[in-house]
């Protein structure tokens, strides 16, 4: 494949720590010679791990990829509180950790499972009255910090030291690991800050499917995107699919749902479990559209994909 602009789909990138998510996107734009690159979820500069990046027509999949749950390996430093809830921030307080034991740390960590409504970090991009929270923090302006329902589960200890611990954890989209660590520090009575974070899972993708930017660049120079590339038709394995051909396909390309396609949708769509259905070509298998069901409107085209 010689034209890099022909690539459509996802790139699973193993982001290094020390650079921003925007830096990753900018690097991919240079590698792929296209502006049409985005991502499906920000990772803080100090964090590493899986970023699902979207290329060309793949950028239209952003909202569907964003909805997935996430998995992380975190490292918590006990005995410290900072303004950013991680060790890059300004230290607000230090406390002794002599009372900590492995059993106590693990016991309190496992209590922090399930749904909870908690304040979001002040250093976050959540907007209040049209302004990002971190802008209030940097300007030392008062603001009421909103609360958000977050969900954490599958908490597994990796290693626990005298004043630190590593855990594997899963969470709902939009949940903050920094907040979970802060809650753990409060439960232990000594405070805690995030000192390391690696995203290992962004449903339905895992970190072992990803490649570094250097590996991706080498693959592209060799004429492909390598194993980290996920084509459009495989990008949403969790979404039910149906296939069409002939006039149904022609009409869909013009933004119309044919009678036969509507009949297929009625048979396939289960409103109790399905949010969307993806429509693929019978021949060739390319992803043609994503269709949803809206009350009072019936089946609606959410996305139609065009390939040059």
Curated annotation (Swiss-Prot):
Gene3D superfamilies named in the record: Pseudouridine synthase
Enzyme Commission code: 5.4.99.25
Signal peptide start-end: none
GO BP annotation list: mRNA pseudouridine synthesis; tRNA pseudouridine synthesis
Enzyme class: isomerase
GO molecular function: RNA binding; tRNA pseudouridine(55) synthase activity
Keywords: Isomerase, tRNA processing
Catalytic activity: uridine(55) in tRNA = pseudouridine(55) in tRNA
Pfam assignment, any one: TruB_C_2
Active site feature: 44 (nucleophile)
Family of the protein in this entry: Belongs to the pseudouridine synthase TruB family. Type 1 subfamily.
Role this protein plays: Responsible for synthesis of pseudouridine from uracil-55 in the psi GC loop of transfer RNAs.
Protein name per the record: tRNA pseudouridine synthase B
